[in-house]
Amino acid sequence: MVIIMPTTYELKIYGKVQHVGFRDRIENIGKGLGINGIIYNYKDGTVRILANFDDEEDKELFKKYIERLEKKDKLIEIEKIEEKRLNTYIEFPEGISRLSSDDILELNKKLDEGVKYIKLIFAELEEHKKVLLEIKDMHVKTVEILSEHTRILNEIKDTLKDIKDKL
């Protein structure tokens, strides 16, 4: 009986992938696909994954799921994924586990990122408020114009009635 050992790969994901919930999504994908490995933020802004794959098809499927995250989550932007086959096999616990070098630092960065997005949301809301106020003003003017037209039409109607009565 031949036992085929999984192959360990390092995947480097470039783009806006740190402090946007990316690693959590990868953990879920890995769990769903039965892939074992670790995931961590690297100091150059990439996210790195060390994972075992039984075959090339599993690895490509995993990468496709990663690439699709960008369509599902507007905070995630993936520029590219690089892969490197490692010359050694690393045995990982079941699933994909997150490594954090400094949980407090990570939390602070995520809070800062969250505040940035909240500010962007408020700026968008202000723009929407301006547009809604403009629409409201146009509505008020339209109602005034329609009221004036209704008054004029009623005058014309009364005048036509008077003419009809005289004939």
Curated annotation (Swiss-Prot):
Q: Which Gene3D superfamilies match?
A: 3.30.70.100
Q: Which GO terms describe its molecular function?
A: acylphosphatase activity
- Taxonomically, which superkingdom? Archaea
Limits of the Acylphosphatase-like domain: 8-106
Q: Look up the signal peptide feature and give its range.
A: none
Record field: transmembrane: none
Q: Name one Pfam family in it.
A: Acylphosphatase
Known SUPFAM superfamilies for this protein? Acylphosphatase/BLUF domain-like
**InterPro entries, from UniProt?**
Acylphosphatase, Acylphosphatase-like_dom, Acylphosphatase-like_dom_sf, Acylphosphatase_CS
Cited PANTHER family: ACYLPHOSPHATASE (PTHR47268:SF4)
Name used for this protein in its record: Acylphosphatase-like protein MJ0809
Task: Name the source organism.
Answer: Methanocaldococcus jannaschii (strain ATCC 43067 / DSM 2661 / JAL-1 / JCM 10045 / NBRC 100440) (Methanococcus jannaschii)
